[in-house]
């Protein structure tokens, strides 16, 4: 399906081309987006194919080029064989040691069965009146064996636990590294269809699944396998015929597993894929959070997110059914075979073919073996998840990228002249195959000359830069550098010769100095001394006109720029980016809209820097503001992928063609003299650039921009404060910036989401106390989300079924002890009858346990899936409830939020579902065996139970050790994940700077700390776990020794002894197994504490609040600022507004102008009530905006920003998303007509049902902007806010959009911010901001006459002729 007809090719935005071939959006049902899919679709790819063959219109050769750029490559090998291939020799040694010791530890229980058989013979002999004289000696002798086994099991358990944890972390670390390396190796076209949220999920949640499947659980599997195998070996040696009967359970159990695992695997893969898809949606929502606030779409977006969760829940329930039946079947077979074995064993015993020692030895050996197999079943989910998660990761790792900066192949580019030629280029974006962007396009860019590209959006300008950078390959024609085809050149060496400056420069979270050095290739940087490097940086800064303002910063070149440079203004970021571009003295300089979003003063300064940088090098410039390219050697006018005309500025004016019309549209043809006059005035002015405040650029700053994308990297303020105390206290305006400490030191782990609403100066201790809750509170909090009756019933039935499972152990003990008692009199006439009766008891127990385990697993998992889905939905809505201040904080990045919604919720499984069922099973077991043992024989019961605190204490300290390191591990891994997310979200910048190797190296370094922490944690926690494992055998020794004493004295009989022994020993053993879940419980408790903290935190501006004055419609929509003072909450030291006074009358169209950082966008933020002012008041209709109900108030306002936000879905869905109530088709069409977009929409293949693509990527800037205007108008707002609504558009698009805005402003109060003064000349009143106050106010004509600050802006833009 084509989103654009061929007639509209020229209007397609060429720089936004990420429409997925398999679009992850479904046509809507009325207002809400729909994400419902069939299970088959979701389990395979979770997408709906728009076309069968998107490239069918191209030749086979062209199709191959396109497919190579976007298609995935299925992994040649996946699963555990592939995972284990990442082990080096040390890992192999660790795993080998772990395997051997795991097997050694697994031998302990079967060996115990041998000892138990010998002791059982001695006890039955004593009960039948035989061997009384040697009884105590025999018992003492065999009790010593228990002690020897205990020592061996303790040592082996410790070794296998530690070695597998360490080896698992090391292997998972290499997979993480390989995955990021593969991601950084991909061509840019691959990222056009891959969501940033999906990368984050893969590198966090999925790699955590892999690590979990490689840790101590692997050791437990070898332990269980060894127990199983050795148990049967011992049993066969003791009596093969009897053991063969017991062995019949093995094929039956394997058959059940064989049927269940494939179904479980399929649904696990489906669930993982849906969660990854939902992460992309989360990233899309929170990247544009201000838009959600402005239009009040939180509930709609939450419902859309919930549809992803429902799909994931469906997979989880399907998985639960299979898991429940499989586990139930395993226990049914086990208990059924026990009944069969004792039935046949009694006959063999009666016939004299078997003695009691062999029968009991074989039984215990097989019993222990089968239990060991059953103990694997709860771990199976970890292994299935591990293998499923690895599949997607290895698909990416194995993908062969056609353009790979890591590959050494290709001719190395060294000394070049810099001549670029595009010859007969045919180009189409792989994710938009229906649009031919360049058609037989040819252009020569001479060496050392400036070539400028102009034309409408979608005409192919940015594509040319992408081809020169070799971000893409054309499907036809060639791109030459000095006569050599780019495809024959080494990619990295090619990009080392090129520097790119983009419209939205990306700076990294480090110092100004480091950001500039990133422009130097490593081959050069490594050869420079410290002094030479500093000289280069300073020279580059001076060339970029950045040196003077850098020297006024708090730490000068050592000043940290903040995440994505948000502490810098737009002009400052741009000039740092230019310095970064020119430091390597590139032969080729590419400038893509480098000044379009700047105010006039910044533009003049930046343009001078660009003019300086362009001298003596090949330069390609894209510009919508023609004033910036009038001096170019060759100006190329591009339209619909073809060159319309080219020549110098004057030559093209003489032609009076397309270029002349563009010039006329911008009213620049007569402005050269005035432009020169302004530049001369700037030359005469002092070189120090006036800075209102450090980074106080509320148009370009992430903190204040109304449509700023969320930053994707995180910091940890605690670690940071320590560093600041040591050396990095930054003082500015005589104030210590402790509260912006998280921006001063880069690349540190983020605070968890739970910490996000805390005051910056709170200590680590106070933060920890705020979040830390005990296990009971966490359990109550998680299950407080059980809401529906079916969930309550499932939870109660699941608990009851789990308790029945737990009660099996004491029932088994009572049956076994009484069964053993009949062996004391083999000559009894009713012996065989008694054997038959007890065999039936075993069969009944088998049937009960089948239903109990099946129902327990299914019911608990059903309830868990519902609860976790609801908690995830609740957390999503809670995050959407937070105010803008919350998202301004550096720790609340998109990466952190996406990770929290994925991994934190996943962690809650440790206190819910099957794990909770296991807890009730164990609790029931402990209580019931205690009651049974005390009722049967209180003396032996008390002595044996007195040892249980040893196991409990060992388990407690293991949990405590894990608890202490879990927080450090979580923060450290989140740091590395956030760094990876930041780098991949800025992949074009990373690629253009050729920084892939550096990013990869930094990421590898960031994984070292968590690896070290994991090793230390394993050494501590493994000690306590091993103690819990070994002490079981000591308890056996004590029980047999004391029991023998009681029996020898005649106080106990054999029934009493074996009832107490089996009940307590096996019961305590199972209690010890629960501590194997301690790591999961720790993670769940920490996650629940953070989510609970966030849930209970109330934002200052609360959209859930019902308080405040209700307003259905504003009366006059008059706006007044009275002595307003304001500082952003995260930058209290910087005053943005300093006593602002202004009045906007009802129905007026007013404009705010001024330099960056003067407070313009801040006023819109205050009108929208994104923030509350510090002093003074903002009044609308004479009422303080604080007194209105926030939701009712925002319904009266509509916002159109510089970067319009569109979501995945159809055009219709995106438009009606802005409606404050249900709207009719006619109302929607009327809004579109006013926005000048209706006719265009009708021309689309599916009209209003045409898909927009991710973030509206299939539409041009002008088209997206007009849809955003329609979305604003459908609200029928009383107040319309326009924040740089046309600044990033080309002249044609700007004209069309401006006409739509003019129509939209009729009959309502309109506030517009604009750098292009031509768009606001007709305003009723123009307010000129300067330093947070109004410097001038009046109409355009009045302000021009005053010859003040506004007049300077007019002259700078050549508008005084108007």
UniProtKB/Swiss-Prot annotation:
All residue ranges annotated as the ABC transporter domain in the record: 420-665, 1119-1356
Any one GO molecular-function label of the UniProt entry: ATP hydrolysis activity
Subcellular location: Membrane
Pfam families assigned to the protein according to its UniProt record, in alphabetical order: ABC_membrane (PF00664), ABC_tran (PF00005)
Domain ABC transmembrane type-1 residue range list: 95-385, 795-1083
Transmembrane segments: 92-115, 138-162, 220-237, 244-264, 320-346, 354-374, 789-809, 835-859, 916-935, 940-957, 1022-1040, 1054-1072
Residues the record lists as binding ATP 1: 455-462
Region called Disordered, residue ranges: 1-45, 748-768
UniProt membrane topology term: Multi-pass membrane protein
Compositional bias (Basic and acidic residues): 33-45
Alphabetical keyword list: Antibiotic resistance, ATP-binding, Membrane, Nucleotide-binding, Repeat, Transmembrane, Transmembrane helix
Protein name: Leptomycin B resistance protein pmd1
Taxonomic path: Eukaryota, Fungi, Dikarya, Ascomycota, Taphrinomycotina
């Amino acid at each position: 399906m084509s989103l654009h007809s061929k007639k509209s090719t020229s209007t397609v935005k060429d720089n936004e081309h990420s429409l997925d071939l398999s679009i992850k959006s479904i046509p809507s049902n009325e207002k809400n987006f729909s994400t419902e899919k069939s299970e088959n679709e979701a389990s395979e790819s979770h997408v709906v194919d728009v076309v069968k063959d998107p490239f069918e219109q191209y030749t086979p050769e062209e199709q191959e080029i396109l497919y190579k750029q976007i298609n995935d490559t299925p992994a040649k090998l996946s699963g555990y064989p592939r995972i284990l291939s990442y082990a080096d020799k040390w890992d192999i040694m660790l795993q080998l040691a772990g395997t051997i010791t795991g097997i050694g530890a697994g031998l302990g229980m079967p060996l115990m069965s041998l000892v138990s058989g010998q002791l059982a013979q001695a006890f039955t002999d004593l009960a039948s009146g035989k061997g009384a004289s040697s009884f105590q000696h025999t018992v003492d002798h065999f009790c010593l064996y228990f002690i020897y086994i205990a020592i061996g099991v303790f040592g082996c358990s410790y070794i296998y636990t530690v070695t597998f944890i360490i080896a698992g972390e090391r292997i998972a670390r290499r997979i993480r590294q390989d995955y990021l390396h593969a991601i950084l190796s991909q061509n840019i076209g691959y990222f056009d269809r891959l969501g940033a949220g999906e990368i984050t999920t893969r590198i966090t949640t999925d790699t955590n699944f892999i690590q979990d499947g490689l840790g101590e659980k692997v050791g437990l599997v070898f332990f269980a396998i060894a127990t199983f195998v050795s148990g049967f070996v011992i049993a066969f040696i003791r009596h093969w015929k009897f053991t063969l009967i017991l062995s019949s359970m093995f094929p039956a159990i394997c058959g059940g597993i064989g049927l269940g695992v494939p179904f479980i695997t399929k649904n696990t893969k489906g669930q993982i894929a849906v969660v990854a898809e939902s992460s992309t949606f989360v990233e899309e929502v929170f990247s544009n959070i201000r838009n959600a606030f402005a239009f009040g779409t939180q509930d709609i977006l939450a419902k859309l997110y919930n549809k992803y969760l429902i799909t994931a829940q469906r997979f989880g329930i399907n998985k639960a059914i299979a898991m429940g039946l499989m586990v139930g079947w395993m226990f049914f077979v086990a208990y059924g075979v026990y009944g069969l074995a004792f039935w046949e064993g009694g006959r063999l015993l009666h016939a004299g073919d078997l003695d009691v020692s062999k029968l009991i030895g074989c039984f215990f050996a097989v019993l222990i073996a089968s239990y060991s197999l059953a103990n694997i079943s709860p771990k199976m989910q970890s292994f299935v998840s591990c293998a499923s998660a690895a599949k997607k990761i290895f698909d990416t790792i194995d993908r062969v990228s056609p353009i790979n900066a890591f590959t050494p192949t290709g001719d190395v580019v060294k000394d070049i002249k810099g001549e670029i030629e595009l010859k007969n280029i045919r180009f189409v974006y792989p994710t938009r195959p229906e649009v031919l962007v360049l058609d037989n396009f040819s252009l020569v860019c001479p060496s050392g000359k400036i070539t400028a590209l102009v034309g409408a959006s979608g005409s192919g300008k940015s594509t040319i830069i992408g081809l020169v950078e070799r971000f893409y390959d054309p499907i036809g024609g060639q791109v030459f550098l000095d006569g050599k085809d780019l495809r024959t050149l080494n990619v990295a060496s090619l990009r080392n010769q090129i520097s790119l400056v983009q419209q939205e420069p990306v700076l990294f979270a480090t110092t100004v100095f480091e950001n500039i050095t990133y422009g130097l290739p490593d081959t050069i940087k490594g050869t420079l001394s410290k002094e030479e490097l500093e000289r280069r940086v300073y020279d580059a800064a001076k060339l970029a006109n950045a040196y003077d303002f850098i020297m006024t910063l708090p730490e000068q070149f050592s000043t940290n720029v903040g995440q994505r440079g948000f502490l810098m203004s737009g002009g400052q970021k741009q000039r740092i980016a230019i310095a970064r571009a020119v430091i390597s003295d590139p032969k080729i300089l590419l400038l893509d809209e480098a000044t379009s979003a700047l105010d006039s003063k910044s533009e003049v300064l930046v343009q001078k820097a660009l003019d300086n940088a362009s001298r003596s090098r090949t330069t390609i410039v894209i510009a919508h503001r023609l004033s910036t390219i009038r001096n170019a050697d060759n100006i190329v006018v591009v339209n619909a992928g073809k060159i319309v005309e080219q020549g110098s500025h004057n030559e093209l004016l003489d032609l009076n063609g397309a270029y002349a019309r563009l010039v006329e549209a911008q009213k620049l043809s007569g402005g050269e003299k005035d432009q020169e006059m302004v530049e001369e005035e700037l030359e005469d002015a002092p070189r120090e650039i006036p800075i209102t405040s450090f980074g106080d650029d509320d148009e370009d700053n992430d903190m204040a921009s109304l449509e700023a994308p969320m930053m994707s990297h995180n910091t940890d303020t605690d670690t940071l404060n320590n560093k600041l105390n040591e050396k990095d206290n930054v003082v500015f305006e005589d104030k210590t910036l402790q509260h912006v400490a998280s921006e001063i030191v880069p690349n540190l782990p983020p605070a968890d989401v739970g910490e996000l609403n805390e005051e910056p100066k709170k200590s680590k201790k106070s933060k920890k106390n705020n979040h830390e809750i005990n296990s009971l509170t966490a359990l109550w909090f998680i299950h407080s989300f059980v809401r529906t009756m079916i969930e309550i019933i499932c939870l109660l039935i699941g608990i009851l079924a789990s308790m029945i499972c737990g009660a099996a152990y004491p029932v088994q003990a009572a049956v076994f002890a009484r069964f053993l008692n009949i062996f004391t009199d083999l000559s009894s006439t009713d012996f065989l009858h008694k054997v038959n009766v007890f065999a039936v008891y075993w069969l009944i127990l088998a049937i009960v346990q089948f239903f109990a385990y099946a129902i327990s697993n299914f019911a608990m998992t059903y309830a868990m899936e519902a609860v976790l889905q609801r908690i995830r939905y609740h957390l999503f809505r809670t995050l959407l409830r937070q105010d803008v201040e919350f998202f301004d904080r550096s720790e609340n990045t998109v990466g952190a939020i996406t990770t929290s919604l994925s991994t934190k919720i996943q962690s809650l499984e440790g206190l819910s579902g099957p794990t909770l069922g296991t807890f009730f099973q164990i609790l029931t077991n402990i209580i019931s065996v205690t009651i049974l043992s005390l009722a049967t024989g209180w003396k032996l019961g008390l002595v044996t139970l007195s040892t249980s605190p040893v196991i409990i204490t060992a388990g407690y300290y293991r949990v405590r050790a894990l608890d202490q390191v879990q927080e450090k591990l979580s923060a450290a891994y989140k740091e590395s994940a956030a760094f990876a997310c930041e780098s991949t979200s800025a992949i074009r910048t990373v690629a253009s700077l050729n920084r892939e190797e550096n990013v990869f190296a930094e990421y590898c370094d960031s994984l070292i700390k968590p690896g070290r922490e994991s090793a230390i944690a394993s050494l501590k926690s493994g000690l306590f776990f091993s103690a819990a494992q070994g002490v079981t055998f000591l308890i056996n020794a004590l029980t047999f020794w004391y029991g023998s004493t009681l029996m020898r004295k005649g106080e106990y009989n054999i029934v009493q002894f074996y009832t107490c022994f089996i009940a307590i020993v096996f019961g305590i053993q199972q209690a010890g197994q629960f501590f194997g879940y301690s790591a999961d419980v720790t993670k769940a408790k920490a996650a629940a504490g953070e989510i609970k903290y966030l849930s209970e935190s109330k934002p200052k501006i609360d959209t859930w609040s019902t308080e405040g004055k209700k307003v259905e419609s504003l009366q006059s929509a008059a706006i007044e600022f009275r002595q307003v003072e304001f500082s952003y909450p995260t930058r209290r030291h910087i005053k943005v507004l300093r006593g602002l006074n202004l009045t906007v009358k009802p129905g007026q169209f007013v404009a705010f102008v001024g330099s960056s950082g003067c407070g313009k966008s801040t006023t819109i933020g205050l009108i929208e009530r994104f923030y509350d002012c510090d002093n003074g008041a903002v009044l609308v209709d004479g009422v303080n905006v604080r007194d209105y109900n926030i939701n009712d108030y925002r319904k009266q306002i509509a916002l159109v920003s510089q970067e319009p936000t569109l979501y995945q879905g159809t055009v219709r869905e995106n438009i009606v998303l802005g409606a404050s109530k249900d709207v009719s088709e006619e109302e929607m069409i009327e809004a579109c007509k006013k926005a000048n977009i209706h006719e265009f929409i009708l021309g689309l293949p599916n009209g209003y049902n045409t898909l927009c693509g991710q973030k509206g990527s299939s539409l041009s800037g002008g088209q997206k902007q007009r849809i955003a205007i329609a979305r604003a108008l459908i609200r029928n707002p009383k107040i319309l806010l326009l924040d740089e609504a046309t600044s990033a558009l080309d002249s044609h698009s700007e004209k069309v959009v401006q006409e739509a805005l003019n129509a939209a402003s009729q009959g309502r109060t309109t506030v517009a911010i604009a750098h292009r003064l031509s768009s606001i000349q007709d305003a009723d009143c123009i307010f000129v901001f300067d330093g947070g106050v109004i410097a001038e106010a009046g109409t355009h004509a009045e302000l021009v006459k005053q010859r003040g600050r506004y007049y300077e802006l007019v002259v700078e833009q050549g508008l005084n002729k108007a």
